[in-house]
Amino acid sequence: MALLQIAEPGQSSAPHQHRIAIGIDLGTTHSLVATVLSGKPKVLNDVQNRRLLPSIVHYGDNTTHYGEEAKPFIIADPKNTIVSVKRFMGRSKADIKFQHPYELVGSENEMPAFETRAGRKTPVEISAEILKQLKARAEDSLQNPVNGAVITVPAYFDEAQRQATRDAAQLAGLNVLRLLNEPTAAAVAYGLDQESNLATDRNYVIYDLGGGTFDVSILRFSQGVFEVLATGGHTALGGDDLDRLIVKWAKKQLNIDVLSDEDYAVFIVAARQAKEQLSTQDSVELKLLEATLTLDRPTFESIIQVALDKTISVCKRVLRDAKLELTDIQNVVLVGGSTRSYAVQKAVREVFAQEPLCTINPDEVVAIGASITANQLIGNSQDGSLLLDVTPLSLGLETMGGLVERLISRNTAIPVARRQEFTTYQDGQTAMLIHVVQGERDLVEHCRSLGRFVLHGIPPMTAGQARIEVTFQVDADGLLTVSAREATSGVQAHIDIKPSYGLSEADTERLLIEGFQHAEEDKNLRHLKETKVEAERELEALEQALKVDADLLDEKQLEALNSAKGSLKAQLEGSDIQAIEQAVQQLKVHSDAFAALRMNRHIDHALKGTKLDDWSKSN
């Protein structure tokens, strides 16, 4: 499918010159690289004819091992063997709650580094090592340098996690054409647009359960256009978690409370093997230390049911977001190695009441879709479809009273830009703090802060006179830039949102679920805050007017005005909206009379020294 005809970085200016573009699935458990050869996508093998590169890096005394060569060290040297590094990407040390054998260093609010035999290594550096291996594989296989790459990320990755992925790619020497959502890549791989001869719209569910992340997206194909209607997921739910549930069961069976790092690694390997074998066998044996356990399919289903229930809950919520019923879904596409599990396929089949599509190798489908997109973006091919990704969470900024003004709503198609005018709150205000937030709630304190910057140089004016245009721009990779410009002076400032850590799975889930649960409460609270802000603005304006023209009021009038002011200030201490609004109206009775006196004075001052003839001449 042809994306919007906008030149991307690295795009060929010579339309008939074939350039090498690759698609990379940078996975939690495995990673792959694919390209398009003679019009057909192909997953590239290494010199030993292996397609999957385990996402593992081992740091030895004098050498570094990757992939399959690093696997034996998971048990032999777990502290120096980094597995599932994707789960650490763009996350703060405080966010990392899951069990792991590593020594993490750094402050709680920053992305940590792993303490290894080769020194401290960040998740970005380790991911770059994996990407370098894939790039080298592609160049060895194709005997040509790679001109550009599309790298896939979970649809639910936030700003920090996407930026960390792009940083890793650049560190690996890759020209990043685009970061592409994994479910979107799967849609491209399946060529769902080939059903374009159908007159009716087609809706598809992409159920992607990988090694460490879960994503579900609903795509609609209509009149040659792919659109992502809604997305959801968990940034830390996947095959790794199924393995951990099996380990938890095994520990209970063997009456073990705590495992050493070395023994835990043994249990994880055995659990993973058992999970894979149960896709084709009714029961398997787990050899754990000096004990052997038997695990059958029904027991396995009951063990992982809690994880499956989470994925189904997300599916139902995304259906609600898209305003669709189960009967509106034409196909369900399975993506990710964990969907090979018969238990996963059974759960999906029962929920959607149809046989899911899994004709393409679920481990390879994302890389294949990425390679097709890369081939298009590099300028090698064009066809008739358009692909629109969406923002996973709403983006906005803080206004007076700690309220959130949303500029870009969740599930908005990207790339996108939104502009909105704001103004100053106080007389003579010469600077404005722009606080950018992400989330679904109406109060800043309930959303996630993405960054702050200050617009300086605003000309001093009366409150409400300045015009500040704020622009939110999300690019095709889902990365956000915010700019602000004052209209009369032209002064401007901007920020590229590059936070040092991302949302934990708990925070991501909280932002969405609380947004739904507290919608009515937030609406009422927003009304209260807005009412208070407007009342405080009235009081501030009145205070300034009294400093200049209080002599216009006699003692009785001033006393009545001050009494109404005091009454309003007292009501502002509470949370009774109706009482505040009544106090505002009572104050307006006196302040309007005062305003009329002020206007008369200013008119008299303006007319002083003029004659009637002057007015006649002007007419």
Swiss-Prot record:
The keyword Signal does not apply. It comes from the Bacteria. The keyword ATP-binding applies. InterPro entries: ATPase_NBD, Heat_shock_70_CS, HscA_NBD, HSP70_C_sf, HSP70_peptide-bd_sf, Hsp_70_fam, ISC_FeS_clus_asmbl_HscA. It holds the Pfam family HSP70. GO terms for biological process: iron-sulfur cluster assembly. One of its GO terms (molecular function) is ATP-dependent protein folding chaperone. Keywords: ATP-binding, Chaperone, Nucleotide-binding, Stress response. Chaperone involved in the maturation of iron-sulfur cluster-containing proteins. Has a low intrinsic ATPase activity which is markedly stimulated by HscB. Belongs to the heat shock protein 70 family. This is Chaperone protein HscA homolog. It comes from Acinetobacter baumannii (strain ATCC 17978 / DSM 105126 / CIP 53.77 / LMG 1025 / NCDC KC755 / 5377).
